[in-house]
């Protein structure tokens, strides 16, 4: 357990997780539009797969029993590498040029890039909530989800308008 003065750091980390995860989803949608278009039959499954992977991340994070900060740091580093390499325009273009039909390329992109990102980042809130044991469970998770969702909102808004 961290001292009470570390709470702002924990909330900053879950804010970054939220910003990064929804930001990655927005960037992924922008990257696949040239290959698949922007209709609801593209965006809805992308959002759905992302949410499913996020749910699996929450489930995985809930089972973590120790090494909380080391695991979150590792997940952030892997997610950063996946974001940098996997969401780069050249990578997406290569996936869609090399794999046919486009639906299969889309599924490979989702399975290899966006879903692993969501799964890794989704573990953050349940893992870091363990470090807030001095609070009521509802209070700790409520504040963590508040900061994560605020980050998600700002990540989706800033990266979609930018």
What are these regions (language model features)?
Residues 1-162:
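Alpha-helical transmembrane segments of multi-pass membrane proteins
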């Amino acid at each position: 357990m961290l001292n009470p003065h570390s709470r702002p750091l924990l909330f900053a980390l879950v804010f970054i997780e939220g910003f990064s995860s929804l930001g990655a989803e927005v960037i992924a949608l922008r990257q696949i539009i040239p290959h698949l278009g922007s209709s609801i039959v593209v965006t809805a499954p992308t959002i759905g797969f992302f949410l499913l992977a996020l749910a699996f991340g929450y489930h995985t994070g809930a089972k973590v029993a120790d090494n909380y900060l080391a695991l979150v740091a590792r997940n952030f580093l892997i997610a950063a590498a996946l974001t940098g390499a996997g969401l780069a325009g050249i990578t997406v273009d290569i996936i869609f040029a090399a794999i046919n039909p486009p639906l299969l390329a889309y599924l490979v992109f989702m399975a290899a890039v966006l879903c692993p990102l969501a799964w890794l980042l989704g573990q953050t809130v349940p893992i870091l909530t363990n470090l807030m044991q001095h609070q009521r469970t509802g209070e700790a998770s409520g504040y963590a989800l508040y900061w994560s969702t605020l980050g998600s909102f700002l990540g989706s808004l800033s990266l979609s308008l930018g």
